[in-house]
Amino acid sequence: MKFFRYFFTLIFLLSFNLFSQENKISKRIYTTKKLVKKPVIDGFINDEAWNVVEWSSDFTQKDPDEGKPPTYQTKFKVMYDAKYLYVAIRAFDDEPEKIERRLSRRDGFQGDRVNVIIDSYHDKRTAFVFTTTAAGVKGEEFASQNGENWDDSWNPIWYTNAKIDDKGWTAEMKIPFSQLRFGKAEEQIWGFNINRTIFRLQERSLWQRIPNDQAGFISEAGELHGLKNLISQKQLEIQPFTVLQYDKYPPEAGNPFRTGKDFRANFGLDAKIGITNDLTLDLTVNPDFGQVEADPGAIALDGFQIFFREQRPFF
């Protein structure tokens, strides 16, 4: 009897394992190539420079009907050179006049948008997320804990543009490698995914399907292949400032400090310097936060503290 019990248990476990493998979503792979000619980042994707790589499409819904084809498809291309990663996106829409195109501040994600998710370390835990809306508003987030935490205070330097046409809307991105972190392998493999949101339909679709019951998000992304001989770019950002103040008023006789006019000058800088691929030096000289956006007024009527986002650049 024990033999048959062990035998049927083994058959059950093997069957369950085979069932799990059959239902596992296979990883999608996009193979990029090094560009021959640099594209102009103007939002139009008809530049000949994009012809060196192929389109990839076949997005699937994430919300509201996970796994089903989206209402409108999306396709993209990726290529690179020594310093930048380039992404072109075509977001189809049969009703372009209904595309939600909202102008907002940076990181304002209201409206139709696409998110390019790059796990450049391929640690399947963290990712850099670059977002552009149909209005060309850009935003960025740093995702950690396998997609459990999203930090939108990260503000790298990169370039994007978007245009609306009779087929929907298009976008181009130019992302400096200096804003990413990656290993030293001769040929890189990065985690990669693209998320599209159609605002009026409250619909999200992904290039690499990730079922809603799947644990993890970054770890389930597709893969970007073909990145060869990348050289880590040292990050160097310098943001100087100068503040001039001139006051004019009636002079006071006998007062050498009230001559009728005052002139003041103040200057300083913020800097971000890449020491190594894993270490960045942030420094400030004579910081002046007079131009920083003030926190909005708020009154707490409950027992919870109010959290305000840090607006000062250095912090």
Predicted regions and their residues:
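Hydrophobic h-region of N-terminal signal peptides that target proteins for export
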Residues: 10-20
